[in-house]
């Protein structure tokens, strides 16, 4: 499913928003949401 990026997931995660330090815990980023 889709999920929101989080600031708490830094290691081993994909950056999601360009101008903010948000990353995806799992899966990959599509624009500003995380897809598994």
UniProtKB/Swiss-Prot annotation:
UniProt KW Transferase keyword: no
Disulfide bond sites: 9-25, 16-29, 24-34
GO CC annotation: extracellular region
GO MF entries: ion channel regulator activity; toxin activity
Coiled coil regions, renumbered to chain: none
Superkingdom of this protein's organism: Eukaryota
Keyword terms of this UniProt record: Disulfide bond, Ion channel impairing toxin, Knottin, Neurotoxin, Secreted, Toxin
Residue ranges the record assigns to the propeptide: 1-7
Record's subcellular location: Secreted
Tissues showing expression: Expressed by the venom duct.
Keyword Secreted: yes
Annotated domain remarks: The presence of a 'disulfide through disulfide knot' structurally defines this protein as a knottin. The cysteine framework is VI/VII (C-C-CC-C-C).
Similarity comment: family membership: Belongs to the conotoxin O1 superfamily.
Chain's role: Probable neurotoxin with unknown target. Possibly targets ion channels.
Name of this protein: Conotoxin Cal6.1h
Organism: Californiconus californicus (California cone)
